[in-house]
A protein has these predicted regions:
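Structural detector of well-ordered beta-strand residues that form the stable sheet scaffold
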Residues: 100, 121, 176-177, 201, ...
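Active-site PLP attachment segment
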Residues: 195-233, 256-261
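N-terminal "arm"/small-domain region of PLP-dependent enzymes with the aminotransferase-like
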Residues: 1-39, 405
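A short alpha/beta connector and helix-capping loop motif
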Residues: 131-138, 190-199, 417
Length: 427
């Protein structure tokens, strides 16, 4: 319980959850775009970003786009066309089709499915890495055997159980689309995330491990797919002497100015990962003895990028907390706390945390969509079904978890104060 009598000095400047960290070369590449008048969606910066993405991640082709969401949209369109054929103009490539999706993620992972007319089916989370549960995925294929597309995200920079998921997806003849927006630079068995699907995406949003203020990349080893994405992203203009269009296109290309920032950031990716790892380790050490644990990782098979440090409170140490659609209330209890209380305490010293991603199956927009847990249909819950021990893992992690300030410019002294505030919540 965080007592009102606790007096912790507020930070003069806010400690952010995860803000951009600039180094200097970024502005030089932006100036280069300005001074050479390449203030468009073509130019050297874009070419360099695509080259650097391929070189670092280990894929054959990269297409720089305006956002990770744009990249994922075109990946879903490609997957839909491959699985079900080219749709008529005005119809989505996934129209009327189910797509298996990570449940505990940001809605940008899922919305592109709907852009193409698909119906997301949410697959529950596992406790080992907080990612898609392979057991639940197999159960989903039993329930919906005709599904041909699966989109998997790696939460907070920690790769999921890639081999298990891929084996199930391949067994059922489906296509994997990998959302590596949060996990750029993370590896699974020595291989970079963003290479495991047929179509893959990364993000350069302002809070990511490296940034362009915006932007993303579509990644693949399929040259035809890369060319198709490049064409679609420039309004699907044909190679004709006039403006001719035979397919639906989009204005999704990355700006050469934004690309200048990304180009300047790329050489610092490993440095950023090392800084994020140090933050995670300091939290892990500093919170020892409290009834909490950090976000889990499979360090035998993966090297996360430690994008965000998170904690989850032990069940017996949770005070009473009730969340509505937009409001929350809790009861202070000695020796116990909850995510809401900790976030309020952190905010009181001018630091930013946030709740864990609210699972997609709990979101109002998707509350009628199918949801699959290890034991089957997660929506069909009678009292007997619940008493049988069916677990909604994503809901549990959301209820007990939170993201801690993870800005790589945060000083050790600032982090120590945040740790002391968290400790005070359990007094």
């Amino acid at each position: 319980m965080f007592k009102e009598s606790n007096k912790f000095e507020k930070f003069e400047s806010k400690v952010w959850l995860s803000s951009p960290t600039m180094h200097g070369p970024e502005i030089e590449y932006v100036k280069e775009a300005y001074e050479t008048n390449w203030m468009s969606t073509v130019g050297k910066n874009i070419n360099e970003v695509e080259r650097m993405a391929c070189e670092y991640i280990g894929c054959k082709y990269a297409v720089a786009l305006s956002a990770g969401t744009a990249s994922l949209h075109l990946a879903m369109k490609l997957a839909g066309i491959e699985a079900y054929g080219m749709p008529k103009v005005g119809h989505g490539a996934l129209e009327g089709k189910k797509v298996f999706c990570s449940d505990m993620t940001f809605d940008a992972t899922v919305n592109p499915v709907v852009y193409e007319g698909g119906e997301p089916v949410f697959i529950d989370t596992e406790y080992d890495t907080w990612n898609m549960d392979p057991v639940a995925l197999e159960k989903a294929f039993e329930i919906y055997p005709d599904t041909k597309v699966v989109v998997v995200a790696h939460l907070y920079g920690t790769p999921g159980k890639v081999d298990e998921l891929n084996a199930i997806i391949k067994k059922h003849g489906a296509i994997l689309v990998e959302d590596a927006a949060e996990s750029m630079g993370a590896t699974y068995k020595g291989v970079q995330t963003g290479t495991f699907g047929k179509y893959n995406t990364i993000s350069f949003n302002g809070n990511k491990i490296i940034t362009g203020s915006a932007g993303g990349c579509f990644l693949t080893d399929d040259e035809e797919a890369a060319n198709k994405v490049r064409k679609w992203s420039t309004q699907a203009r044909e190679n004709a002497a006039w403006y001719q269009h035979e397919e639906l296109g989009y204005n999704y290309r990355m700006s050469n100015v934004v690309a200048g920032v990304v180009r300047g950031q790329f050489p610092y990716l490993n440095e950023h990962i090392a800084q994020k790892k140090a933050i995670y380790e300091r939290y892990k050490e500093g919170l020892k003895g409290l009834p909490v644990s950090m976000n889990p990782m499979d360090l035998e098979n993966t090297q996360p990028n430690y994008w965000l440090s998170c904690l989850i409170i032990d069940k017996e140490a949770m005070c009473k907390q009730v969340r509505g659609e937009q409001d929350v209330c809790y009861v202070k209890e000695t020796g116990k706390s909850c995510p809401t209380e900790i976030l309020e305490a952190i905010a009181s010293i001018n630091a930013e945390g946030r709740p864990i991603w609210k699972p997609m199956h709990m979101q109002p927009i998707y509350r009628l969509n199918p949801f699959v847990v290890r034991d089957g249909n997660g929506r069909a819950r009678s009292n007997a079904y619940i008493s049988g021990g069916v677990a909604d893992v994503g809901m549990d992690i959301f209820t007990r978890g939170l993201c801690l300030p993870s800005d790589n410019k945060m000083t050790t002294a600032q982090q120590d104060r945040i740790i002391e505030v968290i400790k005070a919540c359990f007094e």
